[in-house]
């Protein structure tokens, strides 16, 4: 049988430096969005090595928390503090702002986020996400949803951050790409905070689960797998 010629993406996140013991402190964060209190006195401490999945139906609360932790949004109350040795890279659920109005090609798009601006270097990261040959000269503004996600992952890999924040990263990805992303995040030696509705994706990566229940203060926080979290929640 001939070998398959199909190519698969490669996702590998390599931190430039290891984070210290202190990762993230969240204290009493509260936020109302469009008249709905989506975060109510949320507190937790992220420890070194934590790969935290944000789960549940409160997607607006999850996105608000990501935006607060990355400085895009101010909390109504509460505070947070990143450890001094941490560096963060963020994958937003809505990436349109990264591409709207950008008339140049993918090489130029990625060059905005890189200290090394050589085409060979940038091609390497785009190539991991299956942009090869003349595809790297495609205008960034005409990309499909899946292609934009692949570009955002190329950008994240290039940052060499030791803390990754990903808000619904599996949207627009096919099954092979989702599995490749799961493998890359499972291998990642740093800290993760991510949201997903994909149970298998969560199970392959997370070692801690946090749910932000809508209409209730605080959060449900449990170390372990998603299955263990669901069993614990059921028996509370």
Please place each PLM-identified region on the residue numbering.
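Coiled-coil termination/hinge junctions
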Residues: 1-23
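ABC ATP-binding cassette signature C-motif
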Residues: 16-236
């Amino acid at each position: 049988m001939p070998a398959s010629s199909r190519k698969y993406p490669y996702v590998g996140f390599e931190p430039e430096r290891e984070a210290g013991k202190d990762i993230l402190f969240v204290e009493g964060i509260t936020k109302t969005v469009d008249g709905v209190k989506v975060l109510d006195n949320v507190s937790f401490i992220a420890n070194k090595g934590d790969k935290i999945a944000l789960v549940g139906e409160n997607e607006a609360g999850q996105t608000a928390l990501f935006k607060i932790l990355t400085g895009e949004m101010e909390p109504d109350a509460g505070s947070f503090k990143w450890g001094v040795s941490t560096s963060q890279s963020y994958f937003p659920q809505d990436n349109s702002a990264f591409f709207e109005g950008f008339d140049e090609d993918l090489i130029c798009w990625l060059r905005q986020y890189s200290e090394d601006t050589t085409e060979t270097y940038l091609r390497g990261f785009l190539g991991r996400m299956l942009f090869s040959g003349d595809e790297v000269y495609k205008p960034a503004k005409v990309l499909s949803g899946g292609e934009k996600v692949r570009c955002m992952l190329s950008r994240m890999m290039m940052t060499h951050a030791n803390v990754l924040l990903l808000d619904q990263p599996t949207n627009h990805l096919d099954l092979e790409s989702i599995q490749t992303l799961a493998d890359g995040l499972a291998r990642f030696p740093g800290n993760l905070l991510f949201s997903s509705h994909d149970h298998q994706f969560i199970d392959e990566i997370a070692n801690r689960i946090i749910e932000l229940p809508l209409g209730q203060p605080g959060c449900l926080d449990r170390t372990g797998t998603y299955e263990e979290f669901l069993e614990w929640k059921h028996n509370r």
